């Protein structure tokens, strides 16, 4: 039995939830998100509280109910407050610059990298070595951050590359003769 599915999702002020069969739509101040719920899971809305229960008492039903509850909670948090991920660029000459829906990166390659941002994502560059990715969809924000990091992941010898702001890179010692 999922402990996550047992706790309900409380709706903050300004957030609306519409349940239409297996579709759940969440609307808030920052935007709106939709999610298709699995047929083994039932979602109900009563007095500003969304509760998730499986149709049957199977292990798979409870697992899917827990996953659905976590996804709905992330949707509610996203439309109310939004999500953000911070990246740092470490390395000589590594720079980032946001221009509209394109993130221009100089990462030590012979060419600049132009990353096209998906719909619903905004990027700020407070300094040339910092990137802040914002959006209402937690999965999309994390995926964009992972895509940008994948251009030049931090290497273990000098620590150069693109890393998350809270990431600790394990350093290795160079081979000695």
Curated annotation (Swiss-Prot):
GO terms for molecular function: rRNA binding; structural constituent of ribosome. Residues 154-177 are annotated as: Disordered. It comes from the Bacteria. The keyword RNA-binding applies. Residues 155-171 have a biased composition (Basic and acidic residues). GO terms for biological process: cytoplasmic translation. The keyword Ribonucleoprotein applies. Pfam families: Ribosomal_L6. One of its GO terms (cellular component) is cytosolic large ribosomal subunit. PROSITE patterns: RIBOSOMAL_L6_1 (PS00525). Coiled coil: none annotated. Keywords: Ribonucleoprotein, Ribosomal protein, RNA-binding, rRNA-binding. Belongs to the universal ribosomal protein uL6 family. Part of the 50S ribosomal subunit. This protein binds to the 23S rRNA, and is important in its secondary structure. It is located near the subunit interface in the base of the L7/L12 stalk, and near the tRNA binding site of the peptidyltransferase center. PANTHER family: 60S/50S RIBOSOMAL PROTEIN L6/L9, LARGE RIBOSOMAL SUBUNIT PROTEIN UL6M. This is Large ribosomal subunit protein uL6. It comes from Alcanivorax borkumensis (strain ATCC 700651 / DSM 11573 / NCIMB 13689 / SK2). The gene is rplF.
């Amino acid at each position: 039995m999922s402990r996550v599915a047992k706790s309900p999702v409380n709706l903050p002020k300004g957030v609306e939830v519409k349940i239409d069969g297996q579709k759940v739509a969440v609307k808030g101040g920052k935007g709106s998100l939709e999610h298709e719920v699995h047929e083994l899971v039932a979602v109900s809305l009563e007095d500003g509280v969304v509760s998730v229960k499986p149709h049957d008492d199977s292990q798979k039903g409870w697992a899917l109910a827990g996953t659905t509850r976590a996804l709905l909670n992330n949707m509610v948090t996203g439309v109310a407050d939004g999500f953000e991920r911070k990246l740092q660029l470490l390395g000589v000459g590594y720079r980032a610059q946001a221009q509209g829906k394109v993130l221009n990166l100089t990462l030590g390659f012979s060419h600049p990298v132009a990353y096209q941002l998906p719909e619903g994502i905004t990027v700020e560059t407070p300094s040339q070595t910092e990137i802040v990715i914002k959006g209402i969809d937690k999965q999309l924000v994390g995926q964009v951050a992972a895509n940008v990091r994948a251009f030049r992941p931090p290497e273990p010898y000098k620590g150069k590359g693109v890393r998350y702001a809270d990431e600790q890179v394990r350093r290795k010692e160079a081979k000695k003769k």
